[in-house]
Amino acid sequence: MEETYNPKTVEETAQRIWEESGVFRAREDSGREKFYCLSMFPYPSGRLHMGHVRNYTIGDVIARYQRMRGKNVLQPMGWDAFGLPAENAAMQNGVTPAAWTDANADYMRKQLKSLGLAVDWDREIATCKPEYYRWEQWLFTRLFEKGLIYKKTAPVNWDPVDQTVLANEQVIDGRGWRSGALVEKRDIPMYFMRITAYAEELLAELDDLPGWPEQVKTMQRNWIGKSHGCEVHFPYEDGSDVLKVYTTRPDTLMGATYVAVAAEHPLALEAARDNPELAAFIEECRHGGTAEADLATMEKKGMATGRFVVHPLNGEKLPVWIANYVLWGYGEGAVMAVPAHDERDFEFANKYGLPIKTVIVSTVGAYETVDTKGGWIDAYAEHGRCTNSGKYDGLAFQQAFDAIAADLEAKGLGQKRTQFRLRDWGISRQRYWGCPIPIIHCLSCGDVPVPAEQLPVVLPEDVTIDVGSPLKKMPEWYSTTCPKCGGAAERETDTMDTFVESSWYYARYTCPDNTEAMLDRRADYWLPVDQYVGGIEHAILHLLYARFFHKLMRDAGLVHCDEPFTNLLTQGMVVAPTFYREEGGKKHYFGPTEVELSTDERGRPLGATLKSDGAPVTVGHIEKMSKSKNNGVDPEALIDRYGADTVRLFTMFAAPPDQSLEWSDSGVEGAFRFLKRLWTRAAFSVNTAFSQYGRDELRVTDWALVPLAPNHKEARRMIHATLKQANFDFVRHQFNTVVSAAMKILNTLADDKGFWNCDHLPEGDEKDAFRRSAAVVAFEGYSLLTRLLYPIAPHICDALWRQLMPGTDILDAGWPEVDEAALAQDEIELVVQVNGKLRGKITVPADASRETVEQIALADAQVLRFVEGKPPKRVIVVPGKLVNVVA
C-alpha cells in the first residue's frame, strides 16, 4: 500500500469505480426499506459556492449513512433552471438563456461530481426542458378546469426594472428581491392558484411534521395567519350600501373614530371622480408595494374622502379616509380605525388630528385612559376590560367579543368570521424564461386550456432578449387557432412563476423517464421524501408552495401521501470575515486571497494588510459568504489543492449542520492533516502488522476466544464506546462530534508508545501474542473507523477499505455495530469525597459490592488523611460514580 496520501489519485479512482459500477443508481425494491434523501436543487448560476458544498455534503452524508444501514437509497440531482438571471445574462453576454443555462449546468455538474456525491445521475432533470414542464402545463389545465386556477385582474407588485409581477414574498422592504427596484402597484390580469382553499389543511398538518424544525413551522403558521374575528358592516351615510371590514378586536368597536380604506377600494375610486387631489393621492399610493411587511416601515399617509359611514352600534357618523397602510386584496380592503388601541391607527390619528377614544383598560397596563399627546405604548393594544362602551363596560375580551358579535348579527350588520392572512398565489410572470402558461385566448370562447395532445407548449429558444417579454413580440409564436371553435386565437404570453417548477420536482425524480404521465406508481414507492435539506430562507416561499402543490397532486390522484417531506434539516450559513477600505464614502471589499491576515494564538484576527500594497485594510464583521462582500472561498480551488474529502470533512467538523459555519483556512489545513495521518497510519498497519497474518486470521468472529493484552482490551473498549456515542450522534445529525469520534479512535490506534509498544517484552511467544493482540484489535479498529468516517470522507475510506479487505466493497460491509461485550470493564474508577470535597480516586472491581467499595474507600490513604482517625458517620456510595465519606 502506498504510504503517502495522494487525494487526487484516491478520489479519481473512487469516482471512476462508482461511475463504472453504477452503485448509486436507485431501483425500486418492494422488499427493502427505502430512504429518499434530497437536497434542494441548485439554480445553474455557473459555479458552486461554499453554501452549495455544505448543503450537498450534508445530504450526501445522510444518504451514504442510510445506504450503509441497509436501506434502498435515492439521492437525485437536477437544475432549477428557469429564472431571471438567465435573461439578464443573455442581454449582457449575447447568448440565449437556454445556451447559458445548459453551459452552466454542464460546468456545475462536473463540480458536483468532483465532490463525490452518491447521486443517481440517471434521474437528472432540468426544469427548463419541455419533457419536464409539459406535465406542469398538463396539471395546470386540469386545475384550471376545476377552478383551482383562475384569472382575475388584481393589484400586483410590479417591478419596473425587471418588468414583471412579484409575489408578496418576493418584495423585501418595498423592493424587488432581484432588481432592488422600488415596486409599484398595478392592476394586471393574471392567473392565481387557489392556495387559500387549502389554508386550513396546510395549517393543521404542520402538527403532523415532528421532523421539521419548530422555527419553520412557526413561520408557516404565521404566514398562513389564521385569525378569529368579526365581519362588521358600516352602512353608508345615504343607506345605499355597507362598508365591510374585518377585525380581530370587536371588543374595541366602540372606540372606532374613523374608517380607512385602500386606495383601490370602490368607495375611494368613486370619491376621487370629482376630486383631482384625491385622485392624485390614489395614484401616489399605487407606488407602494402590496406586501404587509412594507406597512411597518412606510410613512403613514392619508386623505379624507368626504364620505361618511354610520357606526353599526351607536349610530355615530364616522369619516372615511384613504390610507396607504390599508391593503386592497387583504380582507375587505378596509379597516375600522381604533386609534387608542392600534399603533398604526394611533400614529395616523395623531398625524391628522382624528379623535382617539379609550375603550379598553388593559389588565397589564398601568393606565386609565390613553395619553393622546404621549407616545404609543404596547399596553394600549393589550386585552383588558371594556370602558366607555355603554352596556359592554366591564366585559373582558371574550365576553365583549361574543356580546358585540351577537348584537351585530341580530341587527344584520355583522357576524363572527374566521380569516386567513394567506392570499392566493399569483403565478403569472411577464417574462420569457419560464414555463409558458397553456391557455389560448379566443374572442368567441374566452380562455381555453391547451388540449393534452397539444402539450407541451414549447418555449421558443431563438429569441432576442430585452426589457419585458419577447413572447409578446412574436406573432409567429402566439398566433394560433382556438381548440374549441377553430377560429383565430392567441396564446397566453405570460409564463409561470419559477416557484411552480420547484414545487413538484422532488416527485418527478421518482420517474423522470415517463413520457406518458406526470407520475407513476414509482412515486408511491419513493414518496414522501424522507430527508430534505435546505436553507431556512425557503421556509415560506418554496416549502409552503411545495406542500400546497403536493396536496394538489394528491387530490388529482397522482400521489397518495399528504405531505412531501417527512424530515427537514435547515443548514446554517457559511460565514467568513470581511475586509474592506472606505473609498469615497463607500466600502470596497477585498477577497480573502488578496489580504495578509495576522492572528493571535487562538486564530482570531488581529489585523490585515492588502498584499498588493502592504497597507492596512479594515477587518469587518463575520458575514455570510457573498459576492457583494467578496468574502467567498472557491470550492474548486480547495478541491484541487486538498481534495474533496478534506473539504467535506472540514464542513462537517467545523459546526453542527443547523448552525452557521465560520470559515477557517487553518481548519481546512487541520482536516487535511488528519486525513494524511489516517492514511499514513493505516498504511503502516497494512504494510507491517497486518501483512504478517491472513485476512481470515485478522477477522475475529468470537472475541471471547481471543486472548488480548490488557491495554488492547481497554483500547477495544474505548473504540466501541466511542462508536456507540457516534452512532447516537449520527442519528441526530451531529456530524461534527462524529468526526471527533473518528479522531479519537485514530489516536488510540496510532499510539506507538502504548498500543503498539512491546519493547518491554522478551522475544518469543509472549511478544508474538502481544503483536497478534495488537493486530486483531487494530484491524477491527480500522475496519470500524473507515466505515464510521465513510459517509463524510468517502473516497479515502473506500480506498482504505480496499486495502483492508481486498476484493470487497465498503458499502456491502454495512454500518459498524457496537460490541456490547467489549464495553464491559473489569475495573472502574470512582471519585472519592470526604465531607463532600474531592480527595482522590479509587479503582474497584466493576462488579464490586457496596461493602467492598466502602472497604476500599476507607482504606485509601487520602481518605485516612482527611478523616484524621475519626470513625465515619456514614458512607454514601453512588454506584459507578463516587463515594462520599461523611466524618
From Swiss-Prot:
A Gene Ontology biological process term: leucyl-tRNA aminoacylation
Signal peptide: none
Domain of life: Bacteria
GO molecular function: aminoacyl-tRNA deacylase activity; ATP binding; leucine-tRNA ligase activity
Key words of the record: Aminoacyl-tRNA synthetase, ATP-binding, Cytoplasm, Ligase, Nucleotide-binding, Protein biosynthesis
Transmembrane segments: none
Catalytic activity field: tRNA(Leu) + L-leucine + ATP = L-leucyl-tRNA(Leu) + AMP + diphosphate
CDD domains: Anticodon_Ia_Leu_BEm, LeuRS_core
Subcellular locations according to the entry: Cytoplasm
Binding site for ATP: 627
Documented EC number(s): 6.1.1.4
UniProt short sequence motif 'HIGH' region, positions renumbered to this chain: 42-52
Enzyme class: ligase
CC terms in the record's Gene Ontology section: cytosol
Keyword Protein biosynthesis found: yes
InterPro entries: aa-tRNA-synth_I_CS, aa-tRNA-synth_Ia, Leu-tRNA-ligase, Leu_tRNA-synth_edit, M/V/L/I-tRNA-synth_anticd-bd, Methionyl/Leucyl_tRNA_Synth, Rossmann-like_a/b/a_fold, tRNAsynth_Ia_anticodon-bd
PANTHER family: LEUCINE--TRNA LIGASE, MITOCHONDRIAL, LEUCYL-TRNA SYNTHETASE
NCBIfam families membership: leuS_bact (TIGR00396)
Family label: Belongs to the class-I aminoacyl-tRNA synthetase family.
Stated name of the protein: Leucine--tRNA ligase
